[in-house]
């Protein structure tokens, strides 16, 4: 048995490495750390043009249909160059979350748009990992209210947000004025975390429960 990257995987790594090498420099990283978004917008545009956003999206929905290994190889390059790319939430966790028979309608609606770069998905699941007693999220009659912190890929006006309440996943569309998103200061200024405030926002339940939550968390950690 051969434990090595295939020729296609090596080509993928080489292509991403060359792209980030030409884009990422110390001046750009400093501007990102100071709060400028020009650099992150540039990197995300290049990712979209290379079709990387749809890496885990099935081919039938406009993506590449590749797997978590290929996603981790790209993640390695993002870390190597400290690139402020929208990746883990948008391009890894969300496709895995929606790409199953139980959520076929949501997948067909949103995954093609993630693949072509016309949609950004943020992920706010800190509620599952470390719920705060004094604040958090509640759902009543299909509407979510409350505050979720440490959301990822949510700093550039996402179109949808994947969140969790009481071991259930939900998808919230942000095309309304009932959501407030603000950036949280962290040690790594190139990797922005966000606080999201929901004001009675309509939510679509994502079927899968605790098993699916654990699955996307594992994928994000890889």
Located regions from the model:
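A generic structural signal for well-ordered coil/turn residues at beta-strand boundaries
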Residues: 117-119, 133, 156-157, 166, ...
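A short, Trp-centered hydrophobic/proline-enriched beta-strand micro-motif
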Residues: 116-128
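Glycine-rich beta->alpha junctions and the first turn(s) of the following alpha-helix
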Residues: 2-8, 12, 180-222
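A short core secondary-structure module
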Residues: 124, 147-179, 184
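Cytochrome P450 C-terminal beta-domain/meander region
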Residues: 131-145
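Residue-level signal for inorganic ion chemistry
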Residues: 20, 74, 103, 123, ...
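Internal helix-loop-helix
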Residues: 49-108, 116, 152-158
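Short secondary-structure junction/hinge motifs that connect adjacent elements
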Residues: 27-49
